[in-house]
């Protein structure tokens, strides 16, 4: 029997700018990639093998696009499966708007959407943390946390049981200094 050729890749795997990627494996066997595009929306691509990618659509349409920062751009999505929902955390900001930017979330039943926006979780001026962007979700011991930050330090805060809002009474905790941006945490056994 002939051997199946091994697929290889060459960067870029998608031939246009998609910074701040977040990937999740869906129950349908596809890997789903969410990224920043032109700050107007969050494109979604999928792949069976992490080599060949196809465009699926965007997380939001013009009518469903978040608007808590009216002229704000969307970037740095973070996708997770919490319970039976796909939860998409996103940043919304205008350049120079370090006190009005913030982080919101949206949910969907399937990784390709459609996503229902739940609006802002917080803005920088509401929690006294300048430049609150670049979200990253993690769960540990049944507790849910959101990390974020961009050149003003990396912060963390505990979330509600469903992960869609801040836990009542939770306050931001600074976990890293001012020279860091874009949190990623990898668990190691």
Positions of PLM-derived features:
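Carbohydrate-active catalytic/glycan-binding domains of CAZyme proteins
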Residues: 1-189
